[in-house]
Design a protein with these regions (language model features):
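Conserved radical SAM core fold
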Residues: 85-87, 175-178, 231-237, 338
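Generic recognition of cysteine residues
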Residues: 21, 87, 123, 134, ...
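Ser/Thr-glycine-rich phosphate-binding loops at phosphate-binding pockets of nucleotides
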Residues: 228
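N-terminal catalytic cores of secreted or lumenal carbohydrate-active enzymes
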Residues: 45-224, 245, 255
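Bacterial Sec-dependent N-terminal signal peptides
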Residues: 1-29
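Substrate-binding and catalytic surfaces of secreted/luminal carbohydrate-active proteins
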Residues: 28-45, 51-62, 168-170, 207-225, ...
């Protein structure tokens, strides 16, 4: 960011924070806080207010009616992946610029309050090299690498200093290669970064690998909220990967991982299954992946829920899983923009991505939404051979100065969600009387304020009337826009 851009960014986030405080202090004045972004960037996380009014009996039917007595899932948070590439780019920035960006992104009082991030356990396809944390055979050789020590941990510590409420979920892309075999029939050693399967003989060592990582992070004042067992377990490609069918994941959790985390002092770290696409990559034997594991009570006792990506299938699978096991959680852990989906075209991506990542995931019972890389350079880098060479970050940074930034759709989506939906919020009922060009989801925060997210897919300004018990407010939705409302206690 240039100094001018830094100043502008801070002004926007500070204005949002100040308006938020004002809205909270002036609830008797019925001030509704409004955050607006449009595809043409004329509104760019812009802050406004409107006013709650007493209902007039002559009013027409409201477009949206909020129903706080109808309650659904509790929300954990929203954020992006803090990959090795993200950390590298952040570390190239001047410290003051980096702090300004992280404050705008994560601070609850001076920014948008993003609060749930994903990190890789070992390398990902956006690391600086291929590696695990135990590349020398023998679990006693587990050790953090320079990528953790010099990049990931300092960045996480800086984020947590800004917002201690930020939660972290960790996911491995592969087990150490000495733990892998070519398949579970031949059991031949498989010294490759991609594909292969976990040798059942090393289930205990691999469970210890997770526990040692959790302890190493804790030793650096970083408490991890949750893990997934394998990133994209049905993907044999990428720069690092490992195939893990549902039967393998079941056996690993049931026989080793669950009790190992418990015995090593991490009984409260949540274990999420799967971490892959809604359509199970169209592999017939892997469909309903988490359901097979939930049906085994000895494995299921250790499992919090299931994580999904959206590179295949639809969000209807979320409700399909929820309806079968409503006590198990759902979280969304990865989506990327890139060349394939015109990722830097905000006019196209803004409303599409909020619909897909914000409205449909949350209305289908997700408790958290996390997108892929927070920050990549203008080339979508650093990245790895055989990994994604066409991905963009939620934010782009120019390598010419490591200052100039462009925020892309995923940054807007997550900021719009996190700014008004607080940790511990509960999704509430909503009656939407508009056409299918107006999409919405609503929540009650722990302080009893209400959060409403509205997507206007119309290409013209659209008047909106929202009813909340015996009050209502109006707002003119700009064309092709995403709007977040924070509504005071009634």
């Amino acid at each position: 960011m240039t100094k001018k851009l830094i100043s502008s960014l801070l002004t926007l986030s500070l204005l949002w924070a100040v308006t938020s405080c004002t809205a909270q202090k002036q609830t008797h004045q019925n001030t509704v806080k409004v955050l607006t972004t449009t595809g043409d960037r004329l509104y760019d996380l812009s802050t406004y207010t409107t006013t709650l009014q007493k209902n007039n009996k002559n009013n027409n039917t409201p477009d949206i009616t909020l129903m706080p007595n109808e309650k659904y899932q509790t929300i954990y948070g929203f954020g992006a992946a803090i990959t090795g590439a993200t950390c590298y780019n952040l570390m190239q920035m001047a410290p003051a610029d980096r702090k300004a960006f992280l404050t705008t992104t994560f601070s609850e009082t001076e920014g948008f309050g993003q609060n749930y991030v994903r990190v890789s356990i070992g390398c990902s396809d956006f690391s600086l090299s291929e590696y695990t944390l135990c590349d020398t055979k023998g679990i006693q050789n587990f050790a953090l690498t320079n990528e953790e020590k010099n990049y990931l941990i300092p960045i996480l510590q800086e984020i947590l200093a800004i917002n201690p409420k930020v939660q972290i979920i960790g996911s491995p892309w592969t087990a150490p290669r000495w733990m892998k075999v070519n398949n579970l029939t031949d059991l031949q050693p498989y010294n490759e970064w991609t594909s292969g399967q976990l040798n059942p003989a090393y289930y205990h060592d691999y469970a210890l690998y997770f526990a040692k990582w959790l302890q190493a992070m804790k030793d650096n004042q970083i408490n991890v909220e949750a893990i997934t067992i394998q990133n994209e377990p049905l993907n044999r490609q990428n720069s690092a990967s490992m195939y893990m069918g549902w039967d393998e994941q079941l056996a690993f959790i049931k026989n080793e991982l669950g009790k190992t985390l418990r015995d090593k002092g991490f009984p409260n770290v949540k274990i999420y299954l799967f971490d892959h696409n809604y359509n199970y990559d169209n592999i017939e034997s892997q469909k309903q992946y988490p359901i097979h594991i939930y049906k085994d009570p000895q494995a299921s006792q250790y499992v919090a829920g299931t994580a999904f990506h959206n590179y295949g299938g639809t969000t209807s699978e979320l409700s399909n899983i929820h309806n079968q096991f409503p006590d198990k959680e759902l979280i969304f852990t990865e989506s990327s923009i890139g060349k394939w989906n015109d990722g830097r075209n905000l006019k196209r991506r803004l409303t599409e991505d909020m619909e897909e990542l914000g409205i449909k995931t949350l209305n289908n019972h997700c408790k958290a939404v996390i997108v892929w890389n927070l920050l990549l350079d203008e080339h979508g880098a650093p990245n790895r051979d055989k990994g994604c060479k066409t991905c963009f970050g939620a934010v782009d940074i120019q390598t010419s100065n490591y200052k100039t930034m462009q925020r892309n759709s995923h940054y807007y989506v997550i900021s719009h969600l996190a700014a008004v939906i607080k940790q511990g919020a509960t999704r509430i009922g909503i009656q939407n009387n508009t056409n299918n060009q107006i999409l919405s989801t609503a929540f009650q925060n722990p302080d009893n304020t209400l959060a409403l997210i509205v997507v206007n897919k119309n290409q013209q300004p659209t008047p909106l009337t929202v009813k909340h018990t015996n009050t209502y407010f109006t707002y003119q939705l700009p064309p092709n826009s995403v709007v977040s409302f924070l509504i005071p206690q009634n």
